[in-house]
């Protein structure tokens, strides 16, 4: 039986899909059969036909082993997209698919839509949120954040919210990291001091994102034994 990790973020457009792609290439390089599953996808790609995240995984970085479950054209929050398209989102079906992939793959990377407080379903008595799905089915998470100005607040508040919800956090990934920026470097150092969580990776901005550049990034990262060991430790405590 494989393991599942939920990839969430401090907000939208912070690079969860990039981080998920990086992890997929890294785990594959480590010899692990890896599946990407983004159960809820909203909004179309620039071609106006494909769904944006699926297009990224399949066409941009060449990760054919990616899959979704609910595809809705409106580029809005899942609960609103479901209302606009008359779609019924079933959390149990999402988990059923995760368990199915765990039986076939070593690692299942589940990419969420937005952050932890994103509503998935609107009910008469309130909202069913992303954090409800994660908590109810006990899926550990990795939190993705941008590395620049605002990273400290966004990361600390997201971690605090996750901990209040009883969600297990495996570590953090920071996107668009510039090692020459005093702000970026200090943000990471400060967050490490404030939070007792491992920083799994600091990913730079890539001039061009392709399968080759993403694979090269993962390979370079794994050349560092400490970084490779950290990924192995993350896997050891995932379920």
From Swiss-Prot:
It catalyses: (7R,8S)-7,8-diammoniononanoate + CO2 + ATP = (4R,5S)-dethiobiotin + ADP + phosphate + 3 H(+). GO terms for biological process: biotin biosynthetic process. Substrate binds at residue 42. This is ATP-dependent dethiobiotin synthetase BioD. Pathway: Cofactor biosynthesis; biotin biosynthesis; biotin from 7,8-diaminononanoate: step 1/2. It comes from Geobacillus sp. (strain WCH70). One of its GO terms (molecular function) is magnesium ion binding. The active site is at 38. GO terms for cellular component: cytosol.
